Amino acid sequence: LAANQIGIEAEKAALDRGVGSQYPAAAGVPELKKEASRFVKAFLNLDISPRACVPTTGSVAGSFGSFIACTQRIPGKDKVLFIDPGFPIQKSQLRIIGVQWEEFDIYAYRGAALHDKLESMLSTGEIAAIVYSNPNNPAWICLEEEELQIIGELATQYDVIVMEDLAYFCMDFRRDMGHPFEPPYPPTVARYTDNYILMLSSSKIFSYAGQRMALACISDKLFDRQFPALAERYKDAGVFGPTLIASILYMITSGCTASTQYAYAEMLRLSTEGKINFVEDTREYARRAERMKKIFTDNGFHIVYDYDATQVVGDGFFFTIGYGNM
């Protein structure tokens, strides 16, 4: 889909104001941080302070930096758990930094069955972070409240950070979501734990992928938590949020493009005010997926991940197909 025109115009205006001559602050421009906090309140009904809403150069950079911080914060707690199917790039990131991971496919562990499987992996004490996308890339399954509660409560119990990738935010088109300050709100693990990092990308909801802009929205409690191991490694205070921003993310991308931050801020602001309906803007993906799936299933293919825990998987950005045993 075409990039959101409001973002384009806001970015042009920022460049015309001269922001291209200035280094952006490592923590992000204040306008974006403010609008990110408002957006999270409007569309998730969560309270995250602006200081804990951190711009990243796409969610790929956000996850890369978060993996580093999560796996270095507690000695011996240094593996990542993927709830698959997932985003292969994230495993490639772990190869770069030499971090090991565990994984399991969610298909056989939907609903209450998730609890024992997840606890068996967290109870080793080695898992530092859990990663998944919701809706899922590539299966388009959506974790439900019961499952997110299990993940959140076990994350608290075993001191694990949940990295929840919300790239396809509000794109479960089976539900009427995306109305600012009105339920229903998308399900999120953030209702069940303070150990979370939410990754919100502009790439899909505003079709702004070319400009590489996202947010890592960190719970305030995690943002302010002090870890002696981080302090020792980075020779700073060891506080999670500031260390992630100044000692890790800045070393990867040296901040985020200033003009694009202003574009994202404006798109978030107008969404929160009800002047951009990004859910309707992206609903075309569901219409296309429905037609494509019918073409495949009419010709002998089947949908591999066909059910969520309690309902048929929806139509959206991705779907998975098989043919016979393939």
Placement of each model-derived feature along the sequence:
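Alpha-helical packing segments of well-folded alpha/beta enzyme cores
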Residues: 14, 32-36, 62, 151, ...
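Short, intrinsically disordered, charge-balanced linker/junction segments flanking boundaries
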Residues: 1-2, 122-125, 232-237, 319-326
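Short beta-strand segments
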Residues: 82, 131-133, 163-166, 200, ...
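Conserved core of the PLP fold type I
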Residues: 16-158, 163, 169-192, 197
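Short, solvent-exposed loop/turn segments at secondary-structure junctions
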Residues: 1, 60, 87-88, 108, ...
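Conserved PLP-binding catalytic core of the aspartate aminotransferase-like
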Residues: 282-326
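Conserved core segment of the aminotransferase class I/II
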Residues: 9-12, 191-283, 296
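N-terminal "arm"/small-domain region of PLP-dependent enzymes with the aminotransferase-like
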Residues: 1-24, 42, 160, 250-251, ...
